[in-house]
Amino acid sequence: MDKEKLDMLYEKYVPEEKLLIAKSARKTIRYIEKNTENFPNKYKVLRDKIISTSYDILKNIYRANIFQDINDKKEIVVNIQMLNFYLEEAYKKEILTNKKLISYTNYLLELDRMTRSWFKYEKSK
């Protein structure tokens, strides 16, 4: 299969992201991956935890949307809190600047607000 056909197939089957919280999580993942690639090798485990947890947030968003389970929504909040903890640890180890930590925190705050609004919406049904 040539490249043009593959591109056409990809465009045809690319998912249309209608869930705003998932869009926000994907944006956060891209930001985190871009900005953690310069972590020192001795903090590789911390970097991997940060990236892994950000993917877990997106996975749990999709699970909560599909299965409509309150536990999946709670797991999103837990993952956001854990990710915030990992980022604070990176700041304490002087891997992240204060400016970067604030930037990461703003992304997480947006996700947290969206998740909690989702909780309230589901409870009001």
Can you describe what each PLM-predicted range is?
Residues 1-125:
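Amphipathic alpha-helical assembly/interaction segments
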